[in-house]
Amino acid sequence: MVNCVVRNWQGEDAGQAELDLKVANEENAAHIVHRALRRQMNNARQGTASSKTRSEVRGGGRKPWRQKGTGRARAGSSRSPLWRGGGVIFGPKPRSYSTKMNRKERRLALRTAFASRAEDLVVVEDFGDNLSRPKTKDLLEAMGRWGVNADSKTLLILADKHDTIYLSARNVEKLKLILASNLNVYDLLAADQIVATQSAIAKIQEVYSD
């Protein structure tokens, strides 16, 4: 159970918000969150790194010198991995890095990661109506009133897409905006502070509670 004070646009206390999520037990929490994080980062890899072996490098068909009698080491190709311009031994080839993890485990890891950041969570009332037009300055001032440092990495969680908030937030270097339905372990762990609207908390409870 996570209990948070809800702040309004002016930064004043405006009530309480509760979030009741089933999390992993203490012995397994770090392990399951780590697995989910590795899965997410592995699945983000393109896997297109490629190098050429000695048989794929252009040239090298002619034997550089005869086998015996020169006093030099034997050489059958100028594209040997030992030579400059030669092929690569055990280099990367295109492959899939995708990692499987059961859906129930993924959701448990996500809930556990979110609950672990409760101390860094700031819950605010829905403030879309307070921004009559896109204005980054107004959003930064509001974050200051909420006790959020704009110079630290901040994750802003909304229930639904709001164009005015998006346009106001996109020019803030260390502020990342995501929807409650798109929560992921990496963003939750990478942020120094997390700001969530009341409706986003309700959406998280609805979508991720088991």
From Swiss-Prot:
Gene3D superfamilies the record matches: 3.40.1370.10
Biased segments, Basic residues type: 60-71
Any one of the GO BP annotations: translation
InterPro entries: Ribosomal_uL4 (IPR002136), Ribosomal_uL4-like (IPR013005), Ribosomal_uL4_dom_sf (IPR023574)
GO MF annotations in UniProt: rRNA binding; structural constituent of ribosome
Stored PANTHER family: 50S RIBOSOMAL PROTEIN L4 (PTHR10746), LARGE RIBOSOMAL SUBUNIT PROTEIN UL4C (PTHR10746:SF17)
Record's function text: One of the primary rRNA binding proteins, this protein initially binds near the 5'-end of the 23S rRNA. It is important during the early stages of 50S assembly. It makes multiple contacts with different domains of the 23S rRNA in the assembled 50S subunit and ribosome.
HAMAP family registered for this protein in UniProt: Ribosomal_uL4_B
Name assigned to this protein: Large ribosomal subunit protein uL4
Gene, per the UniProt record: rplD
